[in-house]
């Protein structure tokens, strides 16, 4: 993954999309955010989509903040679980990429 920086917006840490040889796609976005809205200080969404755009894996911290703090979610196929945030967007993205690699090799 190229990890493309967010152009001219210094708050954007990563904004990238790549297509893998089997036609699946990885789309990642992460930015600094107001810690009052997202206590981690980041808003992110990492997605791995199959060739037919079926959601295979997604990490995110929701579209809206939660009253009791922030929730970090992992969606794998039809499964959902809360996960621990790795501490910063780059480390969390590394964890996601490792999982994408594993799933990709299992499927191909």
Question: Where do the PLM segments sit?
Answer:
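The feature represents the first ordered module of a protein
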Residues: 2-71
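Well-ordered alpha/beta subsegment
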Residues: 78-108
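Single, function-defining residue in the core of a domain
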Residues: 74
